[in-house]
Amino acid sequence: MFRGIYKGSLPPIDPSSIHHGESLADQLQDKDYYSVGWNQYFDQSRDIKLPGTENTFRIYESNVDVVDNGYLFVFLHGGGYTSLSWSLVVDKIKKKNLEKKVRMMCYDCRGHGETKTSDDSNLSIETMVDDCANLINYYQDIIYKNEGGGGGNDDDDQKERLKVIIVGHSMGGSVVIKTSSTNRINNLFGLIVIDVVEGTALLALSSMKSILAKRPKSFDSVKDAIKWSISSNTVKNIESARVSLYFINNFFFFFLTDWFSGLSKEFLSSMALKLLILAGTDRLDRELTIAQMQGKFQLILLPLCGHVIQEDVPTGPKINI
């Protein structure tokens, strides 16, 4: 799975994914701002209610016929985004993965998208870690008990289960790191974190508050939301903006310090295979810089893109994953 990464044999980023010189907004016309449906990128969508709770999570899936002898990728979006920020990455992985050994699931975190919980405003890291571990394990149970996947208690059958790789961007990266450190996810194999590092995240919290204060709380139309995302450089890929920005309300968002505290140490302590994807070396803090030089995790840099790497340059995360 990670062999190509460790051999350093990855191809270069597709230059067509990055716009140089004239801004993307200047290149687009009014007719270019339109929305597309999630079903152009995913196989299906459904809601999963966790047993014993009032929490119902919206999930999007691809390659749902993969139930054993392969990998299960679970994607967690960043704060203020939804599962659909992974649309292009999931679609490109599906089209590249001709042998269909990879199943993919994205879910809307609480307080985001179409997920409904008993307390949507509770975005504490402890709560979101509980959500992550409980949902992934329950989702695996659904695969093995209802969809004919590998299951049972004997060791041979256990080996047939899908190996779980959790992928998180920004806030989602914090959640997957801290969930991984609890050892609560069954069959966890890999951990991929996109553009979140403890040191730089904590330093950026004060400036992030002022940025969020200028962010519109709502838009008159989806078209206006897409226009704003491009003109503000929030998203640098019009194709991704068309599918990920399907809503016009509830754009308010905030950050909590506990998302990032202790992040570097917990990332390094995880027993899973670890990959960190960043938009630049300036995002590395001291602890991770030293650990990377010691070979404790794999680092991939994708320059020339913004914070939302999986939307700006979907070919980058797709190739690395």
UniProtKB/Swiss-Prot annotation:
- Protein's job: Demethylates proteins that have been reversibly carboxymethylated.
Alphabetical list of Gene3D superfamilies matching this protein: alpha/beta hydrolase
Q: Name one Pfam family in it.
A: Abhydrolase_6
Q: Where is the active site?
A: S170, D195, H307
Q: Which PANTHER family does the UniProt record give?
A: PROTEIN PHOSPHATASE METHYLESTERASE 1 (PTHR14189:SF0), PROTEIN PHOSPHATASE METHYLESTERASE-1 RELATED (PTHR14189)
| Record-given protein name | Probable protein phosphatase methylesterase 1
Protein family membership:
Belongs to the AB hydrolase superfamily.
Q: Which organism is it from?
A: Dictyostelium discoideum (Social amoeba)
**What EC number(s) does the entry state?**
3.1.1.89
Q: Tell me which domain of life the UniProt entry assigns to the organism this sequence originates from.
A: Eukaryota
